[in-house]
């Protein structure tokens, strides 16, 4: 579409010569058309809506026979940070929230190219943390690479499990010295049916294992006499 601008032309006035009188009836109207330009913001928005992600699958040796699949953009829900839920800025999480997060994470996990023990060439992504609720206990796993048991502190405050980790590194040479400190922490609301004074923790090869035993529920049976 084009927009039209209409106006009437009149004679120019010169300071050296007297201007002739021109009546408004003798003015000749004409029109000028300008092409309408599409705003760049609309075009950019259209490109973003039609953008796609390209995922490469089935890569073989020597980069032979690779296929690509077009997928719409979607937000990844899996946390891939080294400590998983150990985020100092995250709010306190409950056990049920962790279990729900694990369910969503495993539903969204995709097989990736690699080697596994079976030799099939496809392996699953390892989550940086895991939690399992069994019949008599709750088991947790947190990946803490580079930390020793002296760097990790676990405590129970009221009904909240507190996990803190801190790692200090000092780098020095002939001309420069520096120190880096990394701290992590999380607070987990424990369920009511657990024995807080019998929680066990073990750190092996940068992996923290926590076992929380559940309280034994004794079922009381009462016989009702029939009259």
UniProtKB/Swiss-Prot annotation:
A GO cellular-component term linked to this record: chloroplast nucleoid
Stretches assigned to the sHSP domain: 120-227
A Pfam family recorded for this sequence: HSP20
Gene Ontology annotations of biological process type: chloroplast organization; regulation of DNA-templated transcription; response to heat; response to light stimulus
Keywords per UniProt: Chaperone, Chloroplast, Plastid, Stress response, Transcription, Transcription regulation, Transit peptide
This protein's name: Heat shock protein 21, chloroplastic
Biased composition (Low complexity): 14-34, 56-65
Cellular compartments annotated: Plastid, Chloroplast stroma, Chloroplast nucleoid
Inducers of expression: Highly induced in roots, stems, leaves, flowers and siliques after a heat shock at 30 degrees Celsius. Highly and quickly induced by heat stress during early seedling development.
Described function: Chaperone protein required for seedling and chloroplast development under heat stress, probably by maintaining plastid-encoded RNA polymerase (PEP)-dependent transcription.
Region (Disordered): 14-75
Family: Belongs to the small heat shock protein (HSP20) family.
Phenotype of null mutants: Ivory phenotype seedling under heat stress (30 degrees Celsius). Decrease in transcript levels of class I genes, but enhanced expression of class III genes (e.g. accD, rpoB and clpP) after heat shock.
Main location: plastid
Assembly, per entry: Forms oligomeric structures: dodecameric arrangement of two trimer- of-dimer disks stabilized by the C-terminal tails, possibly through tail-to-tail interactions between the disks. Interacts with PTAC5; the formed complex associates with the plastid-encoded RNA polymerase (PEP) complex not only during transcription initiation, but also during elongation and termination, and with a stronger efficiency in illuminated chloroplasts. Binds to promoter regions of PEP-dependent genes.
Residue span of the annotated presequence: 1-43
Chloroplast in keyword set: yes
Organism expressing this protein natively: Arabidopsis thaliana (Mouse-ear cress)
Taxonomic classification: Eukaryota, Viridiplantae, Streptophyta, Embryophyta, Tracheophyta
Tissue expression from the record: Confined to pollen grains of budding flowers.
């Amino acid at each position: 579409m084009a927009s039209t601008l209409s106006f009437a032309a009149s004679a120019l006035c010169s300071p050296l010569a007297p201007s002739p009188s021109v009546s408004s009836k003798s003015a000749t109207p004409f029109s000028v058309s300008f092409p309408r330009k599409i705003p760049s913001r609309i075009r950019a928005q259209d490109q973003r809506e039609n953008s796609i992600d390209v995922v490469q699958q089935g890569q073989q040796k020597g980069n032979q026979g690779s296929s690509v699949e077009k997928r719409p953009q979607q937000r990844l829900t899996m946390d891939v940070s080294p400590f998983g839920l150990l985020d100092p800025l995250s709010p306190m999480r409950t056990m049920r929230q962790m279990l729900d997060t694990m369910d969503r994470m495993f539903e969204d996990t995709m097989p990736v190219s690699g080697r596994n023990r079976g030799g099939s060439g496809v392996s699953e992504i390892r989550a940086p943390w895991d939690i399992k609720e069994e019949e008599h206990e709750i088991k947790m796993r947190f990946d803490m690479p580079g930390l020793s048991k002296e760097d990790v502190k676990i405590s129970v405050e009221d009904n909240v499990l507190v996990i803190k980790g801190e790692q200090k590194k000092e780098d020095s040479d002939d001309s420069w010295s520096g120190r880096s400190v990394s701290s992590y922490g999380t607070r987990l609301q424990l369920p009511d049916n657990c024995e807080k004074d019998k929680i066990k923790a073990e750190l092996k090869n940068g992996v923290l294992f926590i076992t929380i035993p559940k309280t034994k529920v004794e079922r009381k049976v009462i016989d009702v006499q029939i009259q």
